[in-house]
Swiss-Prot record:
It comes from Bos taurus. This is PI-PLC X domain-containing protein 3. GO terms for molecular function: phosphoric diester hydrolase activity. GO terms for cellular component: synapse. It holds the Pfam family PI-PLC-X. Keywords: Hydrolase, Lipid degradation, Lipid metabolism, Transducer.
Length: 321
C-alpha cells in the first residue's frame, strides 16, 4: 500500500522513508535526489593557508593582502550556508566532497577544502553518521571527487576512517541498477561512497568515480547552463551509472572583480535562480531523465522540495523510463 505521506506534506528529514511503496523497488539511478555543490563550504577557515590546488596568482594575492584577501575569497568560495546536519534535515542526500592535506600540519589531518580549508573530514563524516543513526531509512551518497596533496597513506587513512565511522552501513559496489531503497533497507545499508581514485578498485565498499559522472557547464550564463544540462541528460548513458546534473553557475575572474564585495550568492546565484528552478520543475526522473541534482545555497527557491516531488511521477505513471 502506498504511503499516506503525500508529496504536499513532505517530512524532509525522512523523505525517503515516506516515499510511496510503488517507488521502493525502482533503481536509485532512476530517482530524483537533491544534492549540494561543495557541500562542506558552509565553514571556511579564514585563518588557514590557501589550498594547494589554487593557482600562483591567488597564492600571491593572499600573500600580499592576507586576511582581507581571504575574507573576499570566502564570499566566492562558500556555496552553502547550512551545515551537514542542516542539509540532511532539509532533505539533501548527495554530498560533493573535496579532500586535502594541509601544508605544515603537525597532526597530518585530512580536511575538506575548496580554495581555503574547511572542517576536519572525520568531524563532518561523524556528523552525517549521527543523522543516519537517528533516521535509519534515509541514505546518503558521499562523492569524494577531488584529492589534493594526498599520498597513498592519506588514502589509507581516509578508507580506515570510513570503516570506523560507517562500518556495515556502507553498501559494497555492485551493478548500479540493482540498488533500490528496498534493497538497501533489507540489508541495513545507508551509505554509498564514490571515490574518484584508483584506490576504489582495491576496496569493496568504494564505488568507482566513473559511476557518478558530473558534467560541468563552467558558465555564468543561465541560458547556456540550461542548454548544457538538457544536452547532458540527452546523452546520459541508459544504464550502468548514477548521474549528476549540476545546476551551478561558475564565476569567471571578471565576474568576481565586478562583484568582489558582494559574493557568489548575491551576484550570481540569486539572480539566476528563477530560470534555473524553472528548468528543474520541468524535469522527470528515469533512465533518460534526471537523477541527482546539485545546487549552490540549497535552501533557496524551494530547490529541495521541487527535486523530491519529481519522484511522484512514478506514482502517477508518468516516469521517463
Amino acid at each position: 500500500m502506498a504511503s499516506s505521506q503525500g508529496k504536499n506534506e513532505l517530512k524532509f528529514a525522512d523523505w525517503m522513508a515516506t516515499l510511496p511503496e510503488s517507488i521502493h523497488s525502482i533503481p536509485l539511478t532512476n530517482l530524483a535526489i537533491p544534492g549540494s555543490h561543495d557541500s562542506f563550504s558552509f565553514y571556511i577557515d579564514e585563518a588557514s593557508p590557501v589550498g594547494p590546488e589554487q593557482p600562483e596568482t591567488v597564492q600571491n594575492f593572499v600573500s600580499v593582502f592576507g586576511t582581507v584577501a581571504k575574507k573576499l575569497m570566502r564570499k566566492w568560495l562558500a556555496t552553502q550556508t547550512m551545515n551537514f546536519t542542516g542539509q540532511l534535515g532539509a532533505g539533501i542526500r548527495y554530498f560533493d566532497l573535496r579532500i586535502s592535506t594541509k601544508p605544515r600540519d603537525p597532526d597530518n589531518e585530512l580536511y575538506f577544502a575548496h580554495g581555503l580549508f574547511s572542517a576536519k573530514v572525520n568531524e563532518g563524516l561523524e556528523e552525517i553518521n549521527a543523522f543516519l543513526t537517528d533516521h535509519h531509512k534515509e541514505l546518503v551518497f558521499l562523492d569524494f571527487n577531488h584529492f589534493y596533496g594526498m599520498q597513498k597513506y592519506h588514502h589509507e587513512k581516509l578508507v580506515q576512517m570510513l570503516k570506523d565511522i560507517y562500518g556495515n552501513k556502507m553498501c559494497p559496489a555492485i551493478f548500479a541498477q540493482e540498488v533500490s531503497l528496498k534493497y538497501l533497507w533489507e540489508k541495513d545499508y545507508q551509505v554509498l561512497v564514490f571515490y574518484h581514485s584508483p584506490v576504489a578498485l582495491e576496496v569493496p565498499f568504494l564505488w568507482p568515480g566513473q559511476m557518478m559522472p558530473a558534467p560541468w557547464a563552467n558558465t555564468t550564463d543561465p541560458e547556456k547552463l540550461i542548454q548544457f544540462l538538457q544536452a547532458s541528460i540527452t546523452e546520459r548513458r541508459k544504464k550502468g551509472s548514477f548521474f549528476i546534473s549540476q545546476v551551478v553557475l561558475t564565476p569567471k575572474a571578471s565576474t568576481v572583480v565586478k562583484g568582489v564585495a558582494s559574493g557568489l550568492r548575491e551576484t550570481i546565484t540569486e539572480r539566476a535562480l528563477p530560470a534555473m528552478m524553472q528548468w528543474v520543475r520541468t524535469q522527470k526522473p528515469g533512465e533518460s531523465g534526471i537523477n541527482i541534482v546539485t545546487a549552490d545555497f540549497v535552501e533557496l527557491g524551494d530547490f529541495i522540495s521541487t527535486v523530491i516531488k519529481l519522484n511522484y511521477v512514478f506514482e502517477e505513471g508518468e516516469a521517463n523510463t
